Amino acid sequence: MTAEPRPWGDEHVWDSRAELLQNSLERYFGAPGEQLLNNWHPCEPGDNETFNFWWLAHVLDVRIDAYLRTGEESRIEQARLVYENIRRRNHGSLFNDYFDDMLWLALAVLRLADATGDAALAAQAVRIWEHVHTHGWNDHEGGGIAWRVQQPAYKNTPANGPFVILSARLHERTGEPRFLTAATRTMEWLEKTLVRTDGFVEDGVNRLGDHAIDSQWRFTYNQGLYIGACVELAQAGDDTQLAKASRTAHAAIAELATDGVFTGEGGGGDEGLFKGVFYRYAGQLVRAGGEPELREFLLAGTSRLWESGFQDDSLLAADDWRRPAQGKIAYSTQLSAIMATEVCAALSKEPISS
């Protein structure tokens, strides 16, 4: 059954918006030389001292989004530039101390490999997977991937969700059983340890060495990662996964949304990226399983950003999309706006089904 599209479903409007926001990264955050992007706008002394490895992995991801939307080779060139920048700034290595950082890079690099047919890039994604699998998985807290090298007993959704997604995608790409085995084993651990019976996903366990779950950290990011993991395993043949993803999506909206939007989970920084991760993987759920109510939430919430969050000629996004940006804005926050708008551009091209 197909319904009439909502006013915010015009694909040309969303394509134009996505293009404007892609270009906003250079407009507001562009930096010379190896810095590539300033961490904040406006940028002040000391703001660029942190090398935000995982933010840049998401920059790579959104450039691929732009390429898939437009087919323009310039977007692939931008993606390659970001990848090369990460490698150079990381002393030529694919690895760092944070397993989640490495997994985000692997996911983006694998998408770049798929977009370009570059087998060498696909091999880099496999190298990261093997490194994380070898050094990240252990028996603390019953299994799972550690968050970082220095805390092998601390396990969380930010490390295990991307590992499931990457493992499932590598299995789809290669057919190798080891990837699907790792995906299902990690998903079983995640569901047993951090997914509540209502579908809401907790952040982590044993951060302080006390075996406690960090229930006070309630992030859209974790919900999005679990949704993405479910969608990937559904594509691998597990028919039960889409219903679980739907349950989590609706639990996240019920618990974390206000006035139809996620209103902010901190003052920029890493938290600025969280809702973008939710939008990316919730959009994949809509494309995989229909979900008309979730589709409407994604489109309407991002429309709110464009109607209320941007003023005059400013395209800087706030963490709360109901209001214009004020003060300093991190490019992580801008990335969430770009991801959501790219998701809407993709969804607007598809019919609304029920």
Residue ranges, per PLM feature:
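Structural motif corresponding to the intra-repeat A-B loop/turn of tetratricopeptide repeats
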Residues: 70, 112, 116-119, 170, ...
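Second-shell loop/turn segments in exported
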Residues: 8-9, 49, 117, 175, ...
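Oxyanion-binding "anion nests"
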Residues: 219-257
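Active-site cradle of extracellular carbohydrate-active enzymes
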Residues: 167-171, 179-230
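CBM-like carbohydrate-recognition segments
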Residues: 2-60, 66-104, 112-113, 131, ...
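Extended ligand-binding groove/face enriched in aromatic
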Residues: 76-170, 181-184
